Structure formats: C-alpha cells, structure tokens
C-alpha cells in the first residue's frame, strides 16, 4: 500500500497568485495551518484567513528588501526533515514539520522581455528563496508535497478529500518531478539571459548585449505524446512542445478525429501549415515528404484545393493538406471523395466539414486556431555531438524589394505570380525550383543536387500532369551558378524568373535571360532549406 502523508502545515509563497486564495481557503477548511510570506501572506490575511508570517515563525525578520525571507533552518529544517528519522533533532530546535510547500518563482522571463529592462532589473527578479524551498521539498518528496503549478491545486484538494487529508507517495513524486522541471526551466532562462551579456563595469554600464546566442543554450520542451515509432519503424520517438506553444501551430493544434499523429505526420503538417500562412488570399498547400507538391490560391478554399491538387495528383495521394481559412463542408467533401489523405489542418473547421470528414475515420483532422504575426525565435538542427541554432527564416520580400535586372520588364500579372512562386520556393527543399502561373504551382523540382536538374524536374512534372508551362514564372531558392538552369526553363516555356542573385556568373545568367526574351528579378534574399 502506498505511503500517504497527512497535510497539516503548508507554506505558501507565490509570485503568480492565480487561484492561490481559493486553494488556501480549501486548505484552511481542511485544518491545514498556513505559513506565508510578503504579498501572499497579506492576500490571505486580507481575506480573513488565519496565516502565520514566516518572520514570526522563525523569529527572524525579512531583510535586505526581501532578499532574505525564508532562508532559515526553521523553514528548511521543517521541509527537509525526514519524518521519524529526524524527529528528535527537529524537536530539539523547535522545528515544526512543513508538509506542503506551494511556491512559484519571480517572473524573470516577463521582466527581461519588457522594453528597457536593465541588468539591475533582471537581477532583482532572480528568485533565491523560492527555488531553494522548491528543491528542498522536491528532494524530500517522500515526506513533503511541493506544488508549483496552479493547475495542480484542484487535483491536490481532490486527493486530500479522498484520502483522509493525505497525499499518496506517487502524487508527491509526480509533483516533485514538476518542481524540478520548474526550477530547471527557471535557471535555464537566467543562464540564457546572462550568457548573452558581457560585463563592462566601470563605464556606467551594467552589461552589454553581446549576442543573441548565449554561451550555453537552455531550452525546455514538454512531452505532448509518445509515438508508435519515429521517422522509421525501428526508431522510438515522442513529440515535445514549448510550454507556451504559439497559436496557429501544429504544437498547439487540437485533433478532432483520426488516428494518432505519427512522427512524419507532424513534420509534414508543420511544413504545410507554415507555407500556407504566407498567403493572404484563400490558399491550399499539399505536402508530401516535407515538400509542397501542390500550392494554389483561389476565390475560395474549394477552388484553391482543386488547383493545388491539379499540380500533382500522383504525389498528393497520402499527402498533408493545409488551409488558411475555415475548412468548409464542400471542400472537405471534395477531399475525402477524391483522394487518400493523411492529415487536414485549418485554423477552424466547420461542423459541415467535420461531418464530411467523419466518413473517413482514419483521416486526422486538426484545428490549429488563428495565428498572429510570427514571432522571432530559433530553429534547431541536431548534428552528431552538437546542435546548430539559428534564427527562424521569417524573411519575405515585397514588390519594393525586387530589382529587375533583365532588359524586359515584368507585367503586373507576372509580378503577382513571381511573389506567389517565391513564397512557395521558401518551403521547398534545396535545390528548389518552382514553376507557377495564375496563383497555381505548375511544377515543383525539389531536393536535387544540381539546380538545373530541379528545373528539368519541374518541367517534367508539369508535362506529366498535362499542365501548360508556357507563360509561367519560375522561382529559385538560391542563385543560378550557370546559365544552364535558365536555358532549361526557357526551353520549357518560362517567361520570367525570380532568384536571389549573387553568383559570380550573374551577368552570364542575366544575358541568358535576355537572349530568351525572359525577364529576371533579384530578391537579394536566399531561402535554402535542408
């Protein structure tokens, strides 16, 4: 039988006071004596709850503007004392056992995120007593419960009610894990912040920002699900998410129906969703093996889907489909009646769409919510023995960023298609070539070791599906090192090219475009994707 420990005395000291008053009232109603500090003690006292200030309990006042409050043997002895084994020494020094510690920490992350935050501001929001109590209680979880999340308050009360005001060892252990996760994340944030600073005391400075990248990199992710396997069936895998996953992301999406998401499902769905976010008009992106195989905009979602599917129906089989508008019934019905699909994701899903997809119970239907402007963050790539960290590729060009380098000027229709095509190319594996016309991909050449072969493949794809390349535009994710890619595009019927430029042979490539009567624009921005 599990060893349950009664809760008779609790120490409450929280920065985030969400739900703490209700929790304290519930503890008091169950006969738990309350110890507290500072603002938490005042909140409880003002609500009429019987609470003992830690300074009264220890006989030692808070000092140094609150820097020293709970760092006292009567506090930590009460938390760390092993029941039965340390009872005599605790009695000798008048140390009362503390059975539960309820603590969350100074808002360091919120403080350093504020505009104009100084190093001094950050330093004063480094919690010392809080993490010490959390770690003490977590270490002694055999006898003490540690609660660091407001989400656990109700759970604790329910178990106390069903267990004679006691908590089981399994619960205390689970709470201890959460506590160590909490302090690890907290210390990681502080280390990341300080790791970007170079102390330059003496020039009326307290620190200079040296780099976006700290000396050591600390980041915490929370396991969202275990998976049957990873990229391949012999690889174990799990999916982890940021604690505050961005709205409108795969990590924050809700699965409405279908089988459990696989490792490859999640990777491909992320690729599709991030691509479709680039478009303002109703858009559809179909992805296979992390590459867009069909992308289109339309007057509505149904027309966007029909045109995206038309690009490459063969590759669309078993693909991932993403939309940037609410999924409606007509579009959902067209998908499930036409093709086998692994995942459909949209910001919202209408009831009619849910009903239509329900006919295919294995289809994974996800609702990701509305997204906001993308926040700068980091992307990671694991290498053997190390980690590559870079800023997310949020770059995108507008018409004002483009430079016409050819003799021929693009038409307005070509300009619109060039921007559409460039948005797609950003999400195609390098070397990436995309053909497009009238807001629809015509052919996609992805992942080839030479750029000219990507161009040839895009043309072959279009021909195989009976699509007309003549009059289409082409986007290349990086510069053309030779003119051969332009010659191949011209032979296929491409009229206009958008590319970053920057090759030693740019003039040779521009001359090729002029020879073929094509127009060419430089973006001065590359979009490699590996």
From Swiss-Prot:
One of its GO terms (cellular component) is cytosol. Its EC number is 2.1.2.3, 3.5.4.10. GO terms for molecular function: IMP cyclohydrolase activity; phosphoribosylaminoimidazolecarboxamide formyltransferase activity. PROSITE patterns: MGS (PS51855). Keywords: Hydrolase, Multifunctional enzyme, Purine biosynthesis, Transferase. InterPro entries: AICAR_Tfase_dup_dom_sf, Cytidine_deaminase-like, MGS-like_dom, MGS-like_dom_sf, PurH-like. Residues 1-148 form the MGS-like domain. GO terms for biological process: 'de novo' IMP biosynthetic process. The keyword S-adenosyl-L-methionine does not apply. Pathway: Purine metabolism; IMP biosynthesis via de novo pathway; 5-formamido-1-(5-phospho-D-ribosyl)imidazole-4-carboxamide from 5-amino-1-(5-phospho-D-ribosyl)imidazole-4-carboxamide (10-formyl THF route): step 1/1; Purine metabolism; IMP biosynthesis via de novo pathway; IMP from 5-formamido-1-(5-phospho-D-ribosyl)imidazole-4-carboxamide: step 1/1. The keyword Zinc-finger does not apply. It comes from the Bacteria. It catalyses: (6R)-10-formyltetrahydrofolate + 5-amino-1-(5-phospho-beta-D-ribosyl)imidazole-4-carboxamide = 5-formamido-1-(5-phospho-D-ribosyl)imidazole-4-carboxamide + (6S)-5,6,7,8-tetrahydrofolate; IMP + H2O = 5-formamido-1-(5-phospho-D-ribosyl)imidazole-4-carboxamide. The IMP cyclohydrolase activity resides in the N-terminal region. Belongs to the PurH family. HAMAP family: PurH. This is Bifunctional purine biosynthesis protein PurH.
């Amino acid at each position: 039988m599990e060893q349950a420990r009664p809760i008779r005395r609790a120490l409450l000291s929280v920065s985030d006071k969400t739900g703490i008053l209700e929790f304290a009232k519930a503890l008091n109603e169950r006969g738990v004596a309350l110890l507290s500090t500072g603002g938490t003690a005042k909140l409880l006292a003002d609500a009429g709850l019987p609470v003992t200030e830690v300074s009264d309990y220890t006989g030692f006042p808070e000092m140094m503007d609150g820097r020293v409050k709970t760092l006292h043997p009567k506090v930590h002895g009460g938390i760390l004392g092993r029941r039965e084994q340390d009872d005599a020494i605790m009695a000798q020094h008048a140390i009362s056992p503390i059975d539960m510690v309820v603590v969350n920490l100074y808002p360091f992350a919120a403080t350093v995120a504020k505009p104009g935050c100084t190093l001094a501001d950050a330093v004063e929001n480094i919690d010392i007593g809080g993490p010490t109590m959390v770690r003490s209680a977590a270490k002694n979880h055999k006898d003490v419960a540690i609660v660091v999340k407001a989400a656990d308050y109700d759970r604790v009360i329910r178990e106390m009610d069903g267990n004679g005001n006691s908590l089981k060892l399994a619960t205390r252990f689970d709470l201890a894990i959460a506590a160590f996760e909490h302090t690890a994340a907290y210390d990681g944030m502080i280390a990341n912040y300080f790791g970007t600073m170079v102390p330059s005391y003496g020039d009326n400075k307290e620190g200079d920002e040296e780099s976006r990248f700290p000396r050591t990199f600390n980041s915490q992710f929370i396991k969202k699900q275990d998976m049957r396997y990873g990229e391949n069936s012999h690889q174990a895998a799990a999916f982890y998410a940021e604690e505050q996953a961005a709205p409108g992301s795969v990590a924050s999406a809700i699965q409405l129906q279908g089988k459990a998401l696989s490792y490859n499902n999640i990777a491909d769905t992320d690729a599709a969703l991030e691509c479709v976010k680039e478009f303002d008009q109703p858009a559809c992106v179909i992805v296979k093996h992390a590459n867009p195989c069909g992308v289109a905009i339309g007057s509505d979602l149904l027309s966007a889907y029909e045109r995206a599917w038309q690009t490459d129906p063969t590759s669309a089989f078993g693909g991932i489909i993403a939309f940037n508008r609410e999924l409606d019934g007509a579009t959902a019905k067209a998908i499930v009646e036409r093709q086998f699909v692994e995942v459909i994701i949209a910001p919202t899903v209408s009831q009619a769409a849910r009903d239509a997809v329900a006919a295919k119970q294995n289809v994974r239907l996800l609702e990701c919510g509305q997204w906001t402007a993308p926040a700068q963050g980091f992307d990671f790539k694991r290498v053997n023995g190390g980690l590559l960290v870079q800023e997310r590729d949020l770059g995108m060009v507008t018409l004002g960023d483009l430079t016409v380098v050819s003799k021929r000027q693009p038409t307005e229709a070509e300009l619109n298609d060039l921007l559409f095509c460039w948005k797609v190319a950003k999400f195609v594996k390098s070397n990436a070539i995309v053909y497009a016309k009238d807001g629809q991909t015509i052919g996609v050449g992805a992942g080839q070791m030479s750029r000219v072969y990507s161009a040839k493949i895009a043309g072959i794809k279009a021909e195989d599906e009976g699509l007309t390349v003549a009059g289409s535009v082409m986007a290349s994710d990086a510069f053309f090192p030779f003119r051969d890619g332009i010659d191949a595009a011209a032979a296929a019927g491409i009229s206009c090219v958008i590319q970053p430029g920057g090759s030693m042979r740019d003039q040779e490539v521009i001359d090729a475009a002029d020879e073929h009567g094509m127009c060419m624009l430089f973006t001065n921005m590359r979009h490699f994707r590996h």
